[in-house]
Design a protein with these regions (language model features):
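Conserved donor-binding loop and adjoining core beta-sheet/short helix segment
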Residues: 1-2, 21, 29-84, 187-202
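Short amphipathic alpha-helix that is part of the acyltransferase structural core
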Residues: 1-26, 117-157, 269-270
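A conserved beta-strand-loop-helix scaffold within acyl/acetyltransferase catalytic domains
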Residues: 32, 58-60, 153-205
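Cytosolic beta-strand hydrophobic patch enriched in CBS
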Residues: 42-47, 176-180, 235
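Acyl-donor-binding surface of acyltransferase catalytic domains
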Residues: 59-128, 261-263
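Conserved acetyl-CoA-binding loop-helix of GNAT-fold acetyltransferases
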Residues: 71-77, 206, 212-226, 249
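Conserved beta-strand-loop-alpha-helix junction that forms the acyl-donor binding cleft
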Residues: 90-96, 235-248, 254, 260-267
Length: 270
């Protein structure tokens, strides 16, 4: 049975996640950042005979799912999702396979993309003076770059993306870095989420006209180095072999396999 979590359930959920929080990073970090009871997130547990089978955290148009044994009710999850404007489900690969295997595309068309979660503990120091923190005036260009990207952009609603980036930046939950040429942003990367001791780096993108010139490695190394110096664990998600190779060049090692379920109906689109 799925129950909505209350404030006094926080320690129960954290205990269930335990030290393997890298298997549900966004769920864990949003929980730490906002806390149960916040208007920003909704948190639920699937419980059976007083045992937790799964945890669900709703944030904007995403639901983050974590289950240790994938012994939860997909039918009940589907009913819960009907009450939320969900476009994506993020979870471990095995959980995505379990949900997808019990979710008919005739009910709601979807695609599943598999990838990896990786961590970096050390990065080679390189010359990267061109990397700088983004200014408020850069965000319009950043949103346009991300939304226009053939891989990254398809996971976002444009207005929601802009809202998330600005909100996270103002709250200190993320930092955006850019490389610019003549005041035009040609490369971007950010900490997509940060809490004490942990950060996720994400949204690495380079303008098509400037690709394969080393800018991706330059900005990726710079942001990783900056965050590692602060004593934080640094993680990243990726879904393509090209991105996988780039991460290995920088020094990332994989800690788990990942899955992203994207519903194809366009009711959320601009």
């Amino acid at each position: 049975m799925i129950v909505k979590c209350k404030k006094n359930d926080e320690q129960i959920v954290e205990s269930y996640i335990g030290k393997e929080y890298y298997k549900c990073l966004y769920l864990y970090m949003n929980l730490q950042r906002y806390g149960i009871g916040s208007q920003v997130i909704d948190v639920y547990m699937d419980k059976r005979e007083n045992e937790i089978k799964a945890v669900y955290l709703f944030y904007f148009s995403c639901v983050h799912v974590y289950s240790k044994d994938n012994d939860f009710s997909v039918l009940e999850l589907k009913e819960l999702i009907k009450d939320h404007p969900i476009k994506m489900i993020y979870c471990e690969k095995s959980t995505a396979e379990y949900i997808g295997g019990n979710y008919s595309s005739s009910e709601r068309p979807f695609t599943i993309t598999y990838g990896w979660v990786a961590e970096i503990t050390n990065v080679d120091e390189k010359h990267r003076e061109s990397v700088q923190l983004a200014s408020a005036n850069d965000f319009k260009q950043i949103v346009q770059m991300i939304y226009g990207d053939e891989d990254i952009g398809k996971s976002y609603n444009k207005n929601e993306l802009a809202e998330q980036l600005l909100q996270r930046s103002k709250e200190g939950y993320s930092r955006n870095y850019v490389i610019k040429k003549n005041d035009v942003v040609i490369a971007h990367a950010c900490t997509n989420a940060e809490i004490d001791g942990v950060a996720i780096v994400a949204e690495l993108i380079v303008n098509k006209e400037y690709r394969r010139r080393g800018y991706a490695l330059e900005i990726w190394r710079a942001i990783c180095e900056e965050v590692l110096k602060e004593g934080k664990r640094v993680f990243s998600f990726y879904y393509s072999n090209e991105s996988r190779n780039l991460h290995k060049k920088v020094g990332f090692h994989e800690v788990c396999e990942w899955g992203k379920i994207v519903f194809n109906n366009n009711y959320m689109e601009v």
